[in-house]
């Protein structure tokens, strides 16, 4: 595929979900002539025989979707999509660096206002059940908005892992008194507008410096207009074995610092502060004996990965080990996953995606080298798989090639998200 064809295809992927929203069961008017020719050329290049939106306007993209999913799932046919020449230049093929990404793939922040206006009211680009219509004037403002500045509920990013229980599920434990002789217990939980962390203790804790580890799913958060104070409440229940009424004359009882800011923040102060939770830890300095403590940071939270090029280059994923699905791709994959579950094909497609991903990595490695990579996350968790690819131990695979692999896999996943919603079992 030539560079120009690739650029056209990338642009098409950005808005292809719009097709389904502009057609009814009797009419289909979502495509321009340029869209049709670009999509037809693409389908011809990947050898998809039947192009549904041309020969059956009553079921747009459906026949093509079935062909495409079959194409992805068949080991002997999907090799074309994995070849490095998807990234070839017309003049000088070069796949060992990410110059192609930096130069030819348009970063999010350089997108023109007209592009934003074109997409801002497309229902299918919004995974919410009730799409929000945004006026054209607000659309212009949105085009100049800081990426990732949309408020986020800290509870929505909380997760459980092998060694850490979930968020709400900690409520019962926090509201149960510690048994006699129990060790001190540190915790970090979140409500809709706050993060609460601290240490529960049966005995007074001497003044000192203490470190609260921040889980990866909270380490991508910024908070602005924040106030910091002692509390003993979580989701309407009392946190046991914490003290909220300690005094230290006119001096602060405790301060906190975060790795991204050297200034201490006073706990129980009227100060309004902004801080980032990246860096992996919150440092608590106490000035008096405390029989346990719980500190709340209450404010407006948002994602702190505001380096827009990371949308394509994933540079943010090299900075922190986040497991948040920060691209929102899972929501677009959900219609396809529902269809897979209904047809009993979930497992076989999952195996196909694992095989496809391993074959893709093999394309970027020297010949006859084993791909010893194990994915612990399902195929539809794109950012977690991206992190695994970026960090897995393979010295023969340079970092630049890993970024290309992820960009390559991102495009394949985008195709699945687009075409999968029309997939039907033959």
Swiss-Prot record:
Pfam families attached to this UniProt entry: Phytoreo_P8 (PF07124)
Tell me which domain of life the UniProt entry assigns to the organism this sequence originates from. Viruses
One GO MF term on file is: structural molecule activity
Q: Which InterPro entries does the entry mention?
A: Capsid_hemagglutn (IPR008980), Phytoreo_P8 (IPR009807), Virus_capsid_a-hlx_vir (IPR008935)
Known SUPFAM superfamilies for this protein? A virus capsid protein alpha-helical domain, Viral protein domain
Q: List the disulfide bonds.
A: none
Q: Which GO terms describe its cellular component?
A: host cell cytoplasm; viral envelope; viral outer capsid
What is an annotated GO biological process for this record, any one?
A: fusion of virus membrane with host plasma membrane
The family annotation for this protein states: Belongs to the phytoreovirus outer capsid protein P8 family.
Q: How does it assemble?
A: Homotrimer. Homomultimer.
Its annotated function is as follows:
Capsid protein which self-assembles to form the outer icosahedral capsid with a T=13 symmetry, about 70 nm in diameter and consisting of 260 P8 trimers. Mediates the secretion of assembled virus-like particles from host insect cells.
> What is the recorded name of this protein?
Outer capsid protein P8
What is the scientific name of the source organism? Answer: Rice gall dwarf virus (RGDV)
